[in-house]
């Protein structure tokens, strides 16, 4: 029976009569009553809700002609009652009727509810295929919504739902149907930021990878991201070989650019696997070239790619840039050294760290050379950190590492003169080769076998961890574990960290289980803390896979392991801004009974939210006023991590309250955070820079300031001017991936709270900021590009000026009153004699004096007016852009303003996002004009300008340390 809906708009004020009609036996009367109820349901629902079961019975009666209408009425009643699940259930039973309802709020609410249920049920079905199948009515509604989006080309709306619902079939359909060039990178971004399920993410990345590779011109750089996250070295190797074997320059340059991207973002184990899969230069060459010299073999495309993946090429250009543009203000360092008592080990270490950070990668050790007497005051662990500082200063000098450290390394069959220097030298070796230890790890492992001294073992273990970072080398892991089982507190703490570094990001259950078991067995807190940090490193980036161990650590009775649980959470969910994890960490930060755990919890927020610093700022805004100083310290560090290099005024405003805190270590953390935020900033970028720098100096010079605050100020001076003012703290690579070494470096650096030598790990987070353009032969041609912004905005901060010596003014001699009277009488007598002479001379003299006095202010006014006009012209003539050359500093904030000459000889193979950039040569038939690279020879003095640096290397020197007592 076909029913016609009434258009009668008469007002009904009560539902009693209509509800009575529902009890009639006549179907027509029931349908009529139901139509009227539906027509006025928005007003009558309170009365109807009491007898809604009556209408439900009508829906369940299969013989009732308007079952769908009954379901729709029941749905709207439940909607008004706030029972949305029941409302949706009956709405789906009403067929398409609810989609045509005139109440837009009702319709939109239930559509959103449909989508939410579709996502929930689909994701559940993906994880458990045996679960109840998806309701066809629900999928029909959602499919209808999708079809409308398809018709309007609103693909992204559907993609968001499909990714959350784990529907790979829908994603694949859209990727094949749509030809938008930016859709696949969008899905890739969602996969890396939204998807937490590792297994689904990998399947999605596989789908993306195949989709990218089927394109006529694939986005190889997005492909590179996929293979790194999939840890698929074979695909990467095949791709590099395919591109490098093609005859056109663009493909070859793309291969090199992809190799640089992989080197920047992939773990060491992945890079080693790719290099092993690539043909060696000798194999790639033909048989007649087999006897050619190694230099010729290295010039093959595969040879170049292997050198790039090994890190050799990147550090070669980085050290050239850091050497040539070293802008360290040594006067700041010398003033700090003079203000702090050298015999206090805290202050000696602080100056050592500041010097290492300021000269990171520059090879400039002039501060040590010029202050040998100060250096000789180091003792015990101060010797260790001072020797290890050479590793920070000479970071990346792989080929010269042994020569630099030979004076401090043990000689065969010779007694050790200083175990602290030896341990520091091995630590320095690791810092030089951090994350690129393929050639030195075996040497360190052999040394570990032949030493039993805990201090030397400590340096060796840290060095092995640094060189074997993310290598997943089981043999190396077992060697370190042997030292752990000796149960020595000092060496054992380093062993725990080293084991975590070697197995970084593997989530190895075997490694975690045995480390956790030993942590429960040992009585040494140092070892427990080292193992805890090691476990946190193992679950780096694993997200949901790490939930089990995180829960176990967070529920442990030992506060040291709960402390480790916070860092495990931070590293597992680093950069995700996961709201559930943030809530859990915040709860622990205010509820745990241990101050160390609470401090670590707040610090963890910085790692979790560093991709969304504004969210972090709003999260910790209340925590900076906490009654607990450890929470306040953690808030400062979290701000420093999340807002590093951003110059965020909101973060600096919060920190300005903490630098005046009553607790010394809170002030320490606040100053370190300020420095992290303001790296590579000047007064033009942020007006607070000079004031903050001055505050650091005031804290250091203040005689009665607390030692911990002075330590923080000194570290801050080193961080804000790190790498000769040419590096920044970067937790992401140029392509947007997590920067493994930087995140690990900051994590271990924060353990300086317990052990000062770990402060050197901060250097792992430093990234040089330069535009380094290379041609197809990996040479650096001379070419220019434009920075479309005022030069002053991104200029180096001005260097300090040595104050000029003040001239000593003589104090006027006191004169007795009797002497004054005698002198007055003598003057009167002289005037009486002079009055007899001519008055002409007097007039001339007076006139001349008057003229001079009148002329002077006029001249000064003229000079002032000239100065004003000159200054005014200079302001008007300040250029709005500048032309820069290859190997020039380009800070991250400057990147949006960089442009290239479209008609120039060289243009980039892709958009510049920082770091190394491959250049296509439009005039490849002409010989290029190359920049001469000379950094493999000479360490430079920081006080000399790049053009004034001498060609001859400085004489070798050795630290003036006495033998250990």
UniProtKB/Swiss-Prot annotation:
PTM sites of type Phosphoserine: 952
PANTHER family referenced in this protein's UniProt entry, alphabetically: 26S PROTEASOME NON-ATPASE REGULATORY SUBUNIT, 26S PROTEASOME NON-ATPASE REGULATORY SUBUNIT 1
Comp. bias intervals (Basic and acidic residues): 827-856, 874-883
Keyword Phosphoprotein tagged: yes
InterPro entries in alphabetical order: 26S_Psome_Rpn2, ARM-like, ARM-type_fold, Proteasome/cyclosome_rpt, PSMD1_RPN2_N, RPN2_C
Superkingdom to which the source organism belongs: Eukaryota
Protein keywords: Phosphoprotein, Proteasome, Repeat
Family designation: Belongs to the proteasome subunit S1 family.
GO molecular function, one term: enzyme regulator activity
Annotated function: Acts as a regulatory subunit of the 26S proteasome which is involved in the ATP-dependent degradation of ubiquitinated proteins.
Recorded GO CC terms: cytosol; nucleus; proteasome regulatory particle, base subcomplex; proteasome storage granule
Name of the featured protein: 26S proteasome regulatory subunit rpn2
PC repeat coordinates: 385-418, 424-457, 459-493, 494-528, 530-563, 564-599, 600-632, 634-668, 669-699, 712-744
GO biological process: proteasome-mediated ubiquitin-dependent protein catabolic process; regulation of protein catabolic process
Composition-biased stretches (Acidic residues): 945-965
UniProt-listed Pfam families: HEAT_2 (PF13646), PC_rep (PF01851), RPN2_C (PF18004), RPN2_N (PF21505)
Region (Disordered): 826-883, 934-965
């Amino acid at each position: 029976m076909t029913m016609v809906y009434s258009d009668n708009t008469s007002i009904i004020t009560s539902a009693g009569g209509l509800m009575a009609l529902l009890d009639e036996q006549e179907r027509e009367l029931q349908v009529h009553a139901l139509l009227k109820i539906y027509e006025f349901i928005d007003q009558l629902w309170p009365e109807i809700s009491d007898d809604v079961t009556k209408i439900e019975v009508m829906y369940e009666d299969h013989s009732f002609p308007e079952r769908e209408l009954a379901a729709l009425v029941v749905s709207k009643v439940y909607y008004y009652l706030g029972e949305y699940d029941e409302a949706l259930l009956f709405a789906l039973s009403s067929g398409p009727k609810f989609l045509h309802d005139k109440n837009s709020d009702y319709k939109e609410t239930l559509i959103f509810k449909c989508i939410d249920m579709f996502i929930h049920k689909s994701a559940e079905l993906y994880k458990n295929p045996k679960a109840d199948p998806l309701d066809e009515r629900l999928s029909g509604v959602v499919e209808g919504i999708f079809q409308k989006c398809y018709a309007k080309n609103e693909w992204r709306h559907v993609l968001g739902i499909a990714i959350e619902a784990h529907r790979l079939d829908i994603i694949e359909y859209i990727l094949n149907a749509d030809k938008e060039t930016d859709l696949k990178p969008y899905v890739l971004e969602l996969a890396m930021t939204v998807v937490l399920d590792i297994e689904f993410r990998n399947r999605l990345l596989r789908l993306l990878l195949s989709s990218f590779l089927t394109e006529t011109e694939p986005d190889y750089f997005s492909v590179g991201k996929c293979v790194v996250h999939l840890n698929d070295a074979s695909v990467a190797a095949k791709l590099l070989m395919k591109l490098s074997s093609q005859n056109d320059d663009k493909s070859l340059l793309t291969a090199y650019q992809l190799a640089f991207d992989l080197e920047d973002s992939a773990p060491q184990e992945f890079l080693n696997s790719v290099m092993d899969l690539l043909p060696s230069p000798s194999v790639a060459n033909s048989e007649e070239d087999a006897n050619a010299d190694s230099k010729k073999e290295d010039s093959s495309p595969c040879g170049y790619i292997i050198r790039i993946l090994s890190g050799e090429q990147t550090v070669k250009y980085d050290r050239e840039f850091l050497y040539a543009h070293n802008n360290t203000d040594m006067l700041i360092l010398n003033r700090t050294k003079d203000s702090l008592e050298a015999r206090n080990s805290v202050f000696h270490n602080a100056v050592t760290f500041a010097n290492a950070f300021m000269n990171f990668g520059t090879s400039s050790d002039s501060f040590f050379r010029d202050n040998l007497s100060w250096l000789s005051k180091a003792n015990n662990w101060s010797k260790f950190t001072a020797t290890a500082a050479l590793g920070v200063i000479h970071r990346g000098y792989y080929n010269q590492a042994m020569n630099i450290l030979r004076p401090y390394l043990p000689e065969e069959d010779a007694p050790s003169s200083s175990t602290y220097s030896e341990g520091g030298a091995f630590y320095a070796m690791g810092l030089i080769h951090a994350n690129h230890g393929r050639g030195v790890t075996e040497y360190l492992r052999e040394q570990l076998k032949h030493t039993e001294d805990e201090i030397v073992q400590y340096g060796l273990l840290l060095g092995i961890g640094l060189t074997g970072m993310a290598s997943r080398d089981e043999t190396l892991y077992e060697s370190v574990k042997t030292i752990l089982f000796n149960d020595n507190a000092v060496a054992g703490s380093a062993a725990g960290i080293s084991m975590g570094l070697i197995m970084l990001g593997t989530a190895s259950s075997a490694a975690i289980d045995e480390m956790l078991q030993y942590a429960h067995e040992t009585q040494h807190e140092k070892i427990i803390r080292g193992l805890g940090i090691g476990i946190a490193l193992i679950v780096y980036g694993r997200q949901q896979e790490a939930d089990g161990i995180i829960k176990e650590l967070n529920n442990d009775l030992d506060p040291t392991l709960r402390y480790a649980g916070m860092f495990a959470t931070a590293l597992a969910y680093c950069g995700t801004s996961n709201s559930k994890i943030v809530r859990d960490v915040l709860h622990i930060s205010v509820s745990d009974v241990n101050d160390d755990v609470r401090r670590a919890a707040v610090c963890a927020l910085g790692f979790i939210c560093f991709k969304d610093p504004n969210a972090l700022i709003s999260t910790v805004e209340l925590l900076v006023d906490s009654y607990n100083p450890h929470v306040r310290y953690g808030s400062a560090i979290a701000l420093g991590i999340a807002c590093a290099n951003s110059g965020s005024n909101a973060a600096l405003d919060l920190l300005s309250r903490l630098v005046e805190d009553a607790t010394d270590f809170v002030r320490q953390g606040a100053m370190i955070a300020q420095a992290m935020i303001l790296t590579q900033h000047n007064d033009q970028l942020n007006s607070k820079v000079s004031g903050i720098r001055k505050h650091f100096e005031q804290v250091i010079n203040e005689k009665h300031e607390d030692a911990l605050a002075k330590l923080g100020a000194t570290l801050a001076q080193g961080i804000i001017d790190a790498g000769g003012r040419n590096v920044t703290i970067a937790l992401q690579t140029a392509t947007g991936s997590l920067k493994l070494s930087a995140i690990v470096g900051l994590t271990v650096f924060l353990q300086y709270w317990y052990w000062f030598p770990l402060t050197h790990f901060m250097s792992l987070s430093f990234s040089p900021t330069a535009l380094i353009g290379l041609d197809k032969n990996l040479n650096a041609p001379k070419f220019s590009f434009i920075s479309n912004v005022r030069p002053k905005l991104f200029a180096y901060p001005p260097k300090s000026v040595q104050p000029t010596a003040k001239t000593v003014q003589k104090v006027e001699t006191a004169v007795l009153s009797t002497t004054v009277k005698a002198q007055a009488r003598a003057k009167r007598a002289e005037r009486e004699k002079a009055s007899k002479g001519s008055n002409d001379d007097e007039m001339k003299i007076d006139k001349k004096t008057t003229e001079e006095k009148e002329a002077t202010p006029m001249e000064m006014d003229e000079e002032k007016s000239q100065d004003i006009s000159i200054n005014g012209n200079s302001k008007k003539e300040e250029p709005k852009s500048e032309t820069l050359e290859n190997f020039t500093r380009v800070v991250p904030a400057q990147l949006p303003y960089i442009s290239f000459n479209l008609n120039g000889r060289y243009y980039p193979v892709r958009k510049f996002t920082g770091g190394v950039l491959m250049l296509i040569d439009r005039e490849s038939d002409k010989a290029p004009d190359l920049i001469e690279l000379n950094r493999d020879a000479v360490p430079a003095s920081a006080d000399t300008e790049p053009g004034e640096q001498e060609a001859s290397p400085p004489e070798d020197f050795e630290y003036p340390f006495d033998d250990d007592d």
